[in-house]
Amino acid sequence: MSAAPAYSEDKGGSAGPGEPEYGHDPASGGIFSSDYKRHDDLKEMLDTNKDSLKLEAMKRIVAMIARGKNASDLFPAVVKNVACKNIEVKKLVYVYLVRYAEEQQDLALLSISTFQRGLKDPNQLIRASALRVLSSIRVPIIVPIMMLAIKEAASDMSPYVRKTAAHAIPKLYSLDSDQKDQLIEVIEKLLADKTTLVAGSVVMAFEEVCPERIDLIHKNYRKLCNLLIDVEEWGQVVIISMLTRYARTQFLSPTQNESLLEENAEKAFYGSEEDEAKGAGSEETAAAAAPSRKPYVMDPDHRLLLRNTKPLLQSRSAAVVMAVAQLYFHLAPKAEVGVIAKALVRLLRSHSEVQYVVLQNVATMSIKRRGMFEPYLKSFYIRSTDPTQIKILKLEVLTNLANETNIPTVLREFQTYIRSMDKDFVAATIQAIGRCATNIGRVRDTCLNGLVQLLSNRDELVVAESVVVIKKLLQMQPAQHGEIIKHLAKLTDNIQVPMARASILWLIGEYCEHVPRIAPDVLRKMAKSFTAEEDIVKLQVINLAAKLYLTNSKQTKLLTQYVLSLAKYDQNYDIRDRARFTRQLIVPSEQGGALSRHAKKLFLAPKPAPVLESSFKDRDHFQLGSLSHLLNAKATGYQELPDWPEEAPDPSVRNVEVPEWTKCSNREKRKEKEKPFYSDSEGESGPTESADSDPESESESDSKSSSESGSGESSSESDNEDQDEDEEKGRGSESEQSEEDGKRKTKKKVPERKGEASSSDEGSDSSSSSSESEMTSESEEEQLEPASWSRKTPPSSKSAPATKEISLLDLEDFTPPSVQPVSPPAIVSTSLAADLEGLTLTDSTLVPSLLSPVSGVGRQELLHRVAGEGLAVDYTFSRQPFSGDPHMVSVHIHFSNSSDTPIKGLHVGTPKLPAGISIQEFPEIESLAPGESATAVMGINFCDSTQAANFQLCTQTRQFYVSIQPPVGELMAPVFMSENEFKKEQGKLMGMNEITEKLMLPDTCRSDHIVVQKVTATANLGRVPCGTSDEYRFAGRTLTGGSLVLLTLDARPAGAAQLTVNSEKMVIGTMLVKDVIQALTQ
Amino acid sequence: MLDNGFPLATESNILKELIKPPTILRTVVNTITGSTNVGDQLPTGQLSVVPWRRTGVKYTNNEAYFDVIEEIDAIIDKSGSTITAEIQGVIDACVKLTGMPDLTLSFMNPRLLDDVSFHPCVRFKRWESERILSFIPPDGNFRLLSYHVSAQNLVAIPVYVKHNISFRDSSSLGRFEITVGPKQTMGKTIEGVTVTSQMPKGVLNMSLTPSQGTHTFDPVTKMLSWDVGKINPQKLPSLKGTMSLQAGASKPDENPTINLQFKIQQLAISGLKVNRLDMYGEKYKPF
C-alpha cells in the first residue's frame, strides 16, 4: 500500500530518534513483544490531544489485534477516545470495541452513551454506523438498549438505517435468543418495508432468526417478488433461497400431474410463458372446461415468482444465477427448467472455484433432467488446462449426459482423455467408460473391447482401473467372455496393483467353469507368491482356492490345503480368520457337515451384477446450491427443503388489502371478461361512476359540463333530467363509498340498473354508458376497462338527445355501419402489456392506474336547430381510434330532426380545408324522420393543429357551412408506458420542448381521482404509473405526427402545483398547458 | 465490506469512496500533508438508488470508451479438426462522464449474442424488447456485459499449428517440430503468440531452435513454452529440435497437448458490430 512509506516517515518524526523501533511497520513484528512499556507508550499517545498520534496508536493496536496479540489492557485508554471527533480514529476505536467489549463489559458500558448519542444524529450514516457498532458489542447488559435502538431504527426515516436495523437483528439474536419474540415483531415490521435496500437484509434476518415463521412472508410475498430484481445481489441470493422454501410449502407441485398436463394444458399455458395474464386466463378456461379431471393449475403467485426470477439468470453475479437455477430446478414445471441450462453453462467460464460448485450442481441436475443439458454437451468437454477436480466433475456430467445418440462422440472424447498425463483423471475416465457401458447396452461390447485393449497399456494404474471396470462389466454377462477372462489370467504375471490382482482372481474364481484349464494354474502361481501378496490379494487367493476346491477338487485339493496352511500363519488376523472359516466350510470334517454340504451354494451363489451409479445420484434431496449439497452431508444450519404439500394452502393469505397489485387485478379482469353478462351490459352498468354524471345523458346544450366533472348536475337544463340526475348522484356517492369492494358491488347492482334501463328511462341509461366513471383510479375499475371500452362504441353512438323518447332497441338499427366497435383484442393486448410492465416496476407503491381515455369531450354544437331549420347537429370526440386511418380523430356526429318533415340525403359536401387537413366523410344518411335522430362517425385528420375543419353539410334541399375545431386535447391518443420509459422520454424532451407552469389547485380538486379525471377529460392521455403519490403523469402521442406528449402534474401540499408538458410540438404543448390549467383551476 | 458476515457493500464505487485507490499524485500529497487514503467524507453512495454510480462526478474531458473483447475457446484434435469452439465476449467500458448520463448502446447485429449477462446498471427490459443496452454507467472502468456467441455458428479459428512430435522406441532421442501459421485473419496480424506444452515425464531435456522468439523448457515441470510474438505470413515461425528421452524407458504413450494463445487487435471474431451510442440526461456533448 502506498500509505506505508508515508506512514513510517511520519512515525520517525514523531517518535524521535531515541526509539528507532517506532519506524517499523506495525505488522512486521518485533515491536509488539509482550513488553508493557510499549503499551505505556501507546497509552500516552492515546492520551494526547493530537489526532495524528491517536491515529497512530490506534493503527498499531488494530494491527496487534489482527496479529492475534492481546491488547485488552489498553481498553480504558482506547474507550476514552470513542467520543473523538476524528472519524478515522473513531472507526478504529469501534474496531477495537467490537473485539474486546465482551471481555471488559463494565468498561465497555462507558462507551454506550456515545452510541446512544450517535443514534440520534441527524445524519443517517452516523445513525446507521452507531447502531452497527452498538449491535456488534456483545455485552449482555446492554441487550435492552440494543432492543430499543433496533426498534427505533426500524421505523427510521432513512431506508439505510432500517437496513442496518435488519442487520442488527441476527446479532442481537445470537447474543440473547430470549429476545426472539420481540425481534420477530421488528422483522415483521421491516418485512413490510417497500424499499429495495431493506428487503435483502430483512430476509437475511428472517432466515437467521425465525425461518420457521413462514406466515410472516404471506403478505409480503408478492412485494418481494416484484422488488426482487432491484435488490442488491447479495440480498437477491437470500431472498431467492427463502422464496424457494416458501414456494415449496405454499404451492402444489407442478410436476404432479405431468401426464394430464401433457395432453391438456401444456399448450394452453406453457406456451404463454412470457404472458402471465394470458396464462392465468387459460388456466381458468382449462379449469372451467374440465373441472372433473382437476388438472394442475399453477398458482398465479407461483408463476409470478418464476417469471420475476427469470431475468436474474442474466445477472453478473454467479451466486444469483445459481440461486435462480436452483429455484427453477426445485419449483418450475419440467418444461421450463431448461432455461437455466444456458446460464449455468455460462458460469462454467468463470474461475475454477465457481466452476467446481456449478459443476457439482449440474451433475446432480443432469441425473434428473438429462435433456436440459444435452444441447450443451460440448461445453463440458475437458480442457487440458482444467484442474483435476473440474475434470472429474465434467466427466461425471458427460457420463450422465451420454445416451444412445451421442455415445459415439462421448466415447471418442473419452478415448482422448485416456491418453492424458493426469493419471487420476485417466482412472476416472475408465470408470466413466464403464458406466456408459452399463447404462447403454448398445455400446457395451465396444467399451469392453476398448477396455481390454487398455490392458496392454504400459501404465499400471490404467490397467488396474480397467481390470476393475471389466470385472464389473463381465459380471453382467460372463458366459460370452471366456476369452477376456483368459486374457486377464495371463495378466496376473505383470499387474502389480493389488486391487487389479484381486479383481482378476475373483473373476477367475467366480467363472472358473468357463476357464477350467487355466484356473488351477493361476492358483498354483498365486500359492507360490502368496506370502508376498497384499492382504486384499491374499483374501482373494483363499477365495479362489475354496471355489476351485469345490468345483475341481481333484486338481486343486493339495494346492488349497497348502494355501490354507499358509494363511493359517499369516500375520493378519483377518486372513487367519478367513482361512479357518473356509477350511471348516469346504473340508468335510467328522462331526460338521451340515454346512459343508451347502458350501457350494454359499461360495458359488449367483451374484447380482453391480450397478454402476453416479455418486450424485441421491444428492438432490439437499437443496441445490447449498453447502450441504456440495459436501453431500448435512451442514449446520441447513434448512431442509420441504416437500410439496398435498393440498395447496389457502392462496388468499397472500392477498394484500390494498388492491395495488396489478396481477391480482389481472386475474379478476380475466374472470370478468369471461362472463357474457358483463360484456353485454358492461357499458350500461358501470356502477362505479363518480359524482360526475355523464354529459351525454344531458340535453344538447349541456355540452360544457364535460370538462368540469361534478358540475354536470348543476348545469343540466331540463327538469326531468334533473331528477334523474339526483338519482344518479345518490347512487354515485353510494358507489363511491364502496369503492373498495367495487367489484362485488358491481354484481349486485347490475340487476337494478337493468331494471331501470328497461323502464325506458333512457336518460339514466345512456348516462351510465359514461366511462368517465372509470376514472376513479381504482385498479378494479381498470380491470373493467378493456371490456367496457370495447363495448363503448355502440352505447355512445346510441345515446340520443334527451328529448327524444326512443328505446334502445330501435337505436340499434340506426347505428351506422361505419361505427365499428374497436377491435377488443388489440386493446386488451396493449393494456395487458402495460399491466405487465406495471408489474415489474420498481416501486411497489404504485397504483398501476393506467387509465384508458375517457370518451371525449361532451357534445359541441355543430348546427343549431334554428339555423338548421329543424336539423340539429352536434358532435363529440369519441376518443376511439378511427377505423379507416389511425391518424384521424374520430368524430361522432349526432343528427336530430326536430322539424315536421323528414330530412333526406344528409351528406358532407365539398369541404374547403386548410392544407394538410383531410376528412373521411360519413356515409350518406338517406332519411331522417321527424323526431328521430341518428349518429354517424367521421374521421378528421387535423394534422396536429387546432385549425378548424370547415365543410358543408348538405341535405337534399339545403347546405350548411359548418366547422369543427378540435380542442388540443383531442389531437392525441394515449400511450401506455412505464415510469422508467416515461422518465427516459422526458429526459429527451427537455429545454425548448418543456413547458412548465405553476398553478394553485382549488380545494375541490385535490383528491387523486378528481385530478386524474380532469386531466384526462381535457386531454386524451393515458395515465402513467408513478412512484410518488403527489405526482401524476400522463402520456400520449399526437395522432398525425406521432410525437410524444408527456404531462406531469406535481401537486405539492397546500394546493400549489406545477404542471409540466414535454412535447416536440411546442404549440400543442403550450395550448395543452393552458387547457389543463383551466380545467384544473375552475 | 461485511456486517456480521453479511455483505454490506461490495460495489467498487462505494468502496472507493471509503478508501481512495492509491495514485502516484495522491501518494505524494499524502506524504507531504500527512493525510491518508481513507475518505474523509461519509460514504453517501450507499444511500443512492443507483449504488454503482457516485454522485457529483465531474470531468473536464467527458469521454467514454468501450472495448469489445472476444475470446475463442477451442479444442482442436491432433489432425487439426475442431472438436469444440465457442466465442465468449465481454464489453469493458471506461466511462468518464460528468453528472448522471443515461447511455444507450445499440448493435448492428444483436441477434448474434446468444447468452448475455449484464452489469446491474443495464435495464433488462429494454434489452428484452429492443435489444438495446440502456444504462446509467458506473464511473470509471467496469464490465458492461459479457456474452456468449451461440455454438451453432461455426467459428473460424484464425491460426493453425503443424506439429510433428515423435518418440522412437529404440533411441533415446525424439523429434519435435511445430510450425504456427495464420488462417483467415481478415488481413489483421496475429500478435502475442505464445505456445506452451506439457511434455511427458520421460522427456529429460529438449534442444530446440526457434525461427523467431524465445523458448524455455523447464526440465522439472517438463513445461515447454515458446514466446513467438507476431506471425509474419511470409516467414512462418517454427520451433525445431530434438528431445532427449530417458534412456532405457519405453516411449511415453501420452500425447502432449499444445496450448496456443494469441491476440488479434481490431477484430471481433464473432462479427459483432456496435451501431451507435447515445447519451441522454446531460446537456454537454461527450464526444
UniProtKB/Swiss-Prot annotation, chain A:
GO terms for biological process: anterograde axonal transport; anterograde synaptic vesicle transport; clathrin-coated vesicle cargo loading, AP-3-mediated; intracellular protein transport; intracellular transport; synaptic vesicle coating; synaptic vesicle recycling. Subunit of non-clathrin- and clathrin-associated adaptor protein complex 3 (AP-3) that plays a role in protein sorting in the late-Golgi/trans-Golgi network (TGN) and/or endosomes. The AP complexes mediate both the recruitment of clathrin to membranes and the recognition of sorting signals within the cytosolic tails of transmembrane cargo molecules. AP-3 appears to be involved in the sorting of a subset of transmembrane proteins targeted to lysosomes and lysosome-related organelles. InterPro entries: AP3_beta, AP3B1/2_C, AP3B_C, AP_beta, ARM-like, ARM-type_fold, Clathrin/coatomer_adapt-like_N, Clathrin_app_Ig-like_sf. It is a peripheral membrane protein. It is linked to Developmental and epileptic encephalopathy 48: A form of epileptic encephalopathy, a heterogeneous group of severe early-onset epilepsies characterized by refractory seizures, neurodevelopmental impairment, and poor prognosis. Development is normal prior to seizure onset, after which cognitive and motor delays become apparent. DEE48 is an autosomal recessive form characterized by onset of seizures in the first year of life. Affected individuals manifest global developmental delay, intellectual disability, absent speech, and poor, if any, motor development. Its main location: membrane. This is AP-3 complex subunit beta-2. SUPFAM superfamilies: ARM repeat (SSF48371), Clathrin adaptor appendage domain (SSF49348). Keywords: Cytoplasmic vesicle, Epilepsy, Golgi apparatus, Membrane, Phosphoprotein, Protein transport, Transport. Isoform 1 expression is specific to nervous system. Expressed in nerve terminal and cell body, and is associated with nerve-terminal vesicles. Expression seen in Purkinje cells, cortical neurons, neuroectodermal tumors and graded in cerebral cortex (deeper layers exhibit stronger expression). Isoform 2 is expressed at high levels in brain and testis. It comes from the Eukaryota. Residues 691-700, 716-727, 775-784 have a biased composition (Acidic residues). It is found in: Cytoplasmic vesicle, Clathrin-coated vesicle membrane; Golgi apparatus. The modification Phosphoserine is found at residues 272, 282. Residues 666-677 have a biased composition (Basic and acidic residues). Pfam families: Adaptin_N (PF01602), AP3B1_C (PF14796), AP3B1_C_2 (PF24080). AP-3 associates with the BLOC-1 complex. Adaptor protein complex 3 (AP-3) is a heterotetramer composed of two large adaptins (delta-type subunit AP3D1 and beta-type subunit AP3B1 or AP3B2), a medium adaptin (mu-type subunit AP3M1 or AP3M2) and a small adaptin (sigma-type subunit APS1 or AP3S2). Residues 790-800 have a biased composition (Polar residues). Residues 279-295, 704-715, 757-774 have a biased composition (Low complexity). One of its GO terms (cellular component) is AP-3 adaptor complex. Belongs to the adaptor complexes large subunit family.
